[in-house]
């Protein structure tokens, strides 16, 4: 089987982290975001993966080629000279996607979930139409475009309704699809939206079904959703791979993922919902909650971090405090006793004064 991952462009929503690495290479749960998808695709029997990229492709190539042998997959890079939207990349990769006339998966690189690829493929084969999209249920459908089915069908899509004022459905597009190669005949190699142009045409022809996703789902393309997604991911690990999580103790509260190479000081309180990356050093008396500490960072004694992301190689000084979706880029230093409230700090900066106004960007 084959798959195309829509990697996309600049990752501006996840800055300042994406000023250092393309978004798919930013770690989520201590592995690059895109590796979660590659692993799941390989486990479902996918052997050919196309990455549609238009930003820093050389870094993507270097980083991901090493996974080909590990997961026994062929990874091909389809490089866009201009952004082609969510449908144009399919036309650009037509030779690969259509080569054996079998269906192929398409997915957005920002989506983290319990990927249902094997069940999705079986469901798609059973109904026989051109396409199937994964849908997930949400509590506030008025914020999204929703999927509406025909009254006599649980899966055949009748229409899409953008941000409905009155309730018509609570299912939204989950950013994961399986399509027959015939769908490629509907797409031209130009900037095109699969959601706004291709799918409505398929709906008109009664060729698009939906598949309900079980379990969690999150688009982790911006910091607050990255943190929420981390909570959901750790809960999923607790159900399916509890041995990966740190064992509960007087210092560990709830779901916590710690790389074996990290060093943890005395009298810390860590958790719930914390990820600590490789070669991280945590000092004595540190409090961490609902946060991610990325590779090779240092959190000095008695620092306090909540609902924040600490980028690679950064240092939090003693008695410093970071909260309210603060994000540190690569190699940031927050000096001792400094308070950062919802700040976004670009790489290689040193912070010596409090940041008290949420949304402040330090350039």
From Swiss-Prot:
Protein EC: 2.7.7.13
Entries under CDD domains matching the protein: LbH_M1P_guanylylT_C (cd05824), M1P_guanylylT_B_like_N (cd06425)
Keyword Chloroplast attached: no
Pathway(s) it belongs to: Nucleotide-sugar biosynthesis; GDP-alpha-D-mannose biosynthesis; GDP-alpha-D-mannose from alpha-D-mannose 1-phosphate (GTP route): step 1/1
A Pfam family matched in the record: GMPPB_C
Gene Ontology annotations for the cellular component aspect, listed alphabetically: cytoplasm; cytosol
UniProt xrefs under PANTHER family: SUGAR-1-PHOSPHATE GUANYL TRANSFERASE
Family named by the database record: Belongs to the transferase hexapeptide repeat family.
The name this protein goes by in its record: Mannose-1-phosphate guanyltransferase
Chain's gene name: mpg1
């Amino acid at each position: 089987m084959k798959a195309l991952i829509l990697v996309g462009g600049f990752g501006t929503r996840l800055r300042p982290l994406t000023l250092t690495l393309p978004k798919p290479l930013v770690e989520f749960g201590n592995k690059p975001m895109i590796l979660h998808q590659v692993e799941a695709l390989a486990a479902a029997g996918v052997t050919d993966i196309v990455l549609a990229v238009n930003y820093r492709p050389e870094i993507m190539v270097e980083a991901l080629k090493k996974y080909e042998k590990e997961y026994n997959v062929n990874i091909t890079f389809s490089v866009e000279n201009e952004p082609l939207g969510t449908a144009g990349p399919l036309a650009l990769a037509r030779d690969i996607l259509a080569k054996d006339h079998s269906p192929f998966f398409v997915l957005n690189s920002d989506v983290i979930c319990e990927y249902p690829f094997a069940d999705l493929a079986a469901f798609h084969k059973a109904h026989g139409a051109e396409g199937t999209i994964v849908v997930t249920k949400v509590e506030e459908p008025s914020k999204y475009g929703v999927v509406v089915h025909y009254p006599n069908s649980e899966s055949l899509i009748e229409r899409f309704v953008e941000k409905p004022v009155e309730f018509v459905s609570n299912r939204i597009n989950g950013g994961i699809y399986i399509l027959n190669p015939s769908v490629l005949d509907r797409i031209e190699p130009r900037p095109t939206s699969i959601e706004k142009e291709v799918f409505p045409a398929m709906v008109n022809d009664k060729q698009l079904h939906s598949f309900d996703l079980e379990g969690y789902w999150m688009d982790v393309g911006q910091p607050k959703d990255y943190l929420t997604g981390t909570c959901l991911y750790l809960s999923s690990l607790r159900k399916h791979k509890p041995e990966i999580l740190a064992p509960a103790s007087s210092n560990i509260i709830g779901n916590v993922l710690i790389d074996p190479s990290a060093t943890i000081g005395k009298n810390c309180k860590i958790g719930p919902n914390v990820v600590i990356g490789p070669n991280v050093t945590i000092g004595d008396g540190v409090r961490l909650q609902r946060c991610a500490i990325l590779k090779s960072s240092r959190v000095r004694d008695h620092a306090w971090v909540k609902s924040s992301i600490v980028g690679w190689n950064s240092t939090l000084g003693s008695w410093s405090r970071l909260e309210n979706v603060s994000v540190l880029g690569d190699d940031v230093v927050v000096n001792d006793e400094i308070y950062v409230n919802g700040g976004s700090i670009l790489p290689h900066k040193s912070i010596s004064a409090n940041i008290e106004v949420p949304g402040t960007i330090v350039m």
